[in-house]
UniProtKB/Swiss-Prot annotation:
Protein name (Swiss-Prot/TrEMBL): Multifunctional CCA protein
Sites where the protein binds Mg(2+): 21, 23
Gene3D superfamilies recorded: Beta Polymerase, domain 2 (3.30.460.10), cca-adding enzyme, domain 2 (1.10.3090.10)
Gene for this chain: cca
Protein family: Belongs to the tRNA nucleotidyltransferase/poly(A) polymerase family. Bacterial CCA-adding enzyme type 1 subfamily.
Note: A single active site specifically recognizes both ATP and CTP and is responsible for their addition.
Cofactor binding mode and count: Magnesium is required for nucleotidyltransferase activity. Nickel for phosphatase activity.
GO biological process: RNA repair; tRNA 3'-terminal CCA addition
Cysteines engaged in disulfide bonds, as pairs: none
HAMAP family per UniProt: CCA_bact_type1, CCA_bact_type2
Organism whose genome encodes this protein: Acinetobacter baumannii (strain ATCC 17978 / DSM 105126 / CIP 53.77 / LMG 1025 / NCDC KC755 / 5377)
Length: 412
């Protein structure tokens, strides 16, 4: 039996890109051979085994044949006669169809090294079209390797367009779409993922709420980039640049969905777009089964981001109620995530990317002020329901004093 390192580890090794996961393919072995050597079986659909010591995955070389729609619509065949070339041809991109043996020798039957050198993402064979998830994977690779200058081969982009138009993407489960998208959102250039999906026509099928933003105008005095879709991707760039969490990145992505629902006669103004956005954000989250915590922040940012931009002019009571809705006393980290998302929105505008956003520091200081006021600060004779009422009163008074101090400093 022969063992080869395959896939992403070889690709990233040749690129000089860091990698962690290692996947191996085993040629000329049977499940019985693997079990006899102490490997643990883990594959449900096809024979995959864990190494007894390293726990790394070893899969028997296999071929596959399309038998139905979607990601799981395949029949697999594994046998000692299946060659390395047979196994590699079923992979998505040439740069992922390179293998390395235990002596470090490279096997590259489909030109992956040449495409690595020329910075091209190219499909291995027409079998690429049999798995709709590959459209999302290529978009994610386009985002990951954007800093290296990689481009999608024209024939691959055309095939992705054909797949998007065919309706095959409808067979993808919400879990698979979210898993691939959440991974893409954590890339340093996540905006390229969504731009690629738009370029191949997949965005309107998978994320119609986001696709609808493109071509919708905004007031140029506030948004020099004008287009709502471009603003969304520029805001996402800011979140990636700051290395913010998945929750923040997703909230930034969907914060302006309501602008796609602005009546035509009101354009380019978007009055009440925050309220209009609640329904499409909720629909998108429920359709993709987005985790609850991620959904909650997205809805908060959608509903409240204008209040953050206007925070220094808010009345103390209004600011307290905003902080309360963000669960400031129990979850200060959520307030921080909210501030981060709002700052990305403010900086996701053409020519304003480096403009200061003092609202962020104001919000953080306000959060610390209300959190610093405890029951122990109240008069001893306060009892029962009065405790909660007086705590609120103290916090609002403290916010009023903070606002006055801030205004005095800004006018001095």
């Amino acid at each position: 039996m022969q063992v080869y390192l395959v896939g992403g580890a070889v690709r990233d090794y040749l690129l000089g890109h860091p990698y962690q996961e290692k996947d191996y393919v085993v040629v000329g072995a049977t499940p019985e051979h693997m079990l006899a050597q102490g490997f643990q079986p883990v594959g449900k659909d096809f024979p995959v085994f864990l190494h007894p010591e390293t726990k790394e995955e070893y899969a028997l070389a296999r071929t596959e044949r399309k038998s139905g729609q979607g990601y799981h619509g395949f029949q697999f065949f594994t046998d000692t006669t299946v060659s390395l070339e047979d196994d590699l041809i079923r992979r998505d991109l040439t740069i992922n169809a390179i293998a390395m043996d235990q002596d470090g020798k490279i096997y590259d039957p489909y030109g992956g090294q040449n495409d690595l050198e020329n910075k091209i993402l190219r499909h291995v064979s027409e079998a690429f079209a049999e798995d709709p998830l590959r459209v999302l994977r290529v978009a994610r690779f386009a985002a990951r390797y954007f800093p290296y200058g990689f481009q999608i081969a024209p024939e691959t982009l055309q095939l992705m367009q054909t797949m998007a138009d065919s309706g095959e993407l409808d067979a993808l489960t919400p879990e698979r779409v979210w898993k691939e998208t959440s991974r893409a959102l954590m890339e340093n250039h996540a905006d390229i993922y969504f731009q690629t999906l738009r370029n191949c026509g997949a965005l309107k099928h998978l994320f119609p709420e986001i696709d609808a933003l493109f071509g919708v105008p905004q007031r140029p005095e506030y948004h020099p980039e004008v287009d709502c879709g471009i603003h969304t991707l520029m805001s996402l760039q800011q979140a990636c640049k700051s290395n913010y969490s998945l929750d923040v990145r997703f909230a930034v992505l969907v914060h302006d969905l309501g602008k796609a629902l602005t009546p035509a006669e009101e354009l380019p103004r978007h009055i009440m777009h925050e309220e209009r956005g609640i329904k499409p954000v909720t629909q998108l989250c429920e359709r993709l089964r987005v985790p609850t915590q991620t959904k909650q922040l997205a809805l908060s940012v959608c509903k409240e981001h204008l209040k953050c931009h206007q925070i220094m002019s808010l009345k103390p009571g209004t600011l307290w109620r905003l902080l309360q809705r963000l669960d400031v006393l129990r979850r200060p980290e959520r307030v921080e995530a909210f501030v981060q998302a709002c700052e990305c929105d403010a900086k996701g505008r053409l020519g304003l990317e480096d403009r200061p956003y003092p609202q962020a520091q104001y919000m953080r200081e306000a959060m610390q002020i209300v959190r610093s006021i405890k029951v122990q600060d109240l008069p001893e004779n306060i009892k029962g329901a009065e405790i909660g009422e007086m705590l609120i009163q103290y916090r609002i008074e403290a916010l009023a004093e903070f606002k006055n101090q801030h205004q005095s400093l800004s006018h001095s």
